[in-house]
């Protein structure tokens, strides 16, 4: 992709040297050629960006795979369930230890 040569400020501030019959025609022609090239570059960039916007819109309306999203959503509940199960096991062990060791202390 061609690079942009002039900014709007550059175009606004451009001054041409004058010759006997007015501005130097060669300098003005070169400047205008570069302006035309810039506009062609802008048009090309705009078209590429429009195409990318369309591609992203289509990608957004057609998600990759619902199973991928569900897989990530399922990870959290699985961890919570495992934590709850581990907590229940620890409570049972604690209760059993109290029963076993509590009886030994009284005997």
UniProtKB/Swiss-Prot annotation:
GO cellular component term, pick one: cytoplasm
Tell me the keywords, alphabetical order: Cell cycle, Cell division, Cell shape, Coiled coil, Cytoplasm
Write out the annotated subcellular location: Cytoplasm
**InterPro entries documented for this protein:** Cell_cycle_GpsB, DivIVA_domain, DivIVA_fam
Query: Coiled-coil region(s) at which residues?
Result: 32-65
Set out the biological process GO terms recorded for this chain's protein. Answer: cell division; regulation of cell shape
**Major subcellular location class:** cytoplasm
Positions of the UniProt region annotated as Disordered: 57-80
Against Gene3D superfamilies, the record matches this protein to:
6.10.250.660
Carries keyword Transferase?
no
Q: Where are the transmembrane segments?
A: none
Q: What does this protein do?
A: Divisome component that associates with the complex late in its assembly, after the Z-ring is formed, and is dependent on DivIC and PBP2B for its recruitment to the divisome. Together with EzrA, is a key component of the system that regulates PBP1 localization during cell cycle progression. Its main role could be the removal of PBP1 from the cell pole after pole maturation is completed. Also contributes to the recruitment of PBP1 to the division complex. Not essential for septum formation.
PANTHER family the record matches: CELL CYCLE PROTEIN GPSB, CELL DIVISION PROTEIN DIVIVA
Protein family per UniProt: Belongs to the GpsB family.
Subunit field text: Forms polymers through the coiled coil domains. Interacts with PBP1, MreC and EzrA.
Please report the name of this protein according to its UniProt entry.
Cell cycle protein GpsB
Instruction: Tell me the classification of the organism that encodes this protein.
Output: Bacteria, Bacillati, Bacillota, Bacilli, Lactobacillales
Question: What is the name of the gene encoding this protein?
Answer: gpsB
């Amino acid at each position: 992709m061609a690079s942009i040569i002039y900014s709007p400020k550059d175009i606004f501030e451009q001054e041409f040297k004058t010759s006997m019959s007015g501005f130097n025609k060669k300098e003005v022609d070169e400047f205008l050629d570069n302006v035309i090239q810039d506009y062609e570059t802008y048009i090309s960039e705009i078209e590429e960006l429009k195409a990318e916007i369309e591609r992203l819109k289509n990608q957004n309306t057609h998600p990759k795979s619902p199973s991928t999203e569900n897989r990530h959503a399922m990870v959290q509940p699985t961890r919570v369930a495992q934590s709850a199960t581990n907590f229940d096991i620890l409570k049972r062990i604690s209760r059993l230890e109290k029963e076993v060791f509590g009886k030994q202390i009284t005997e």
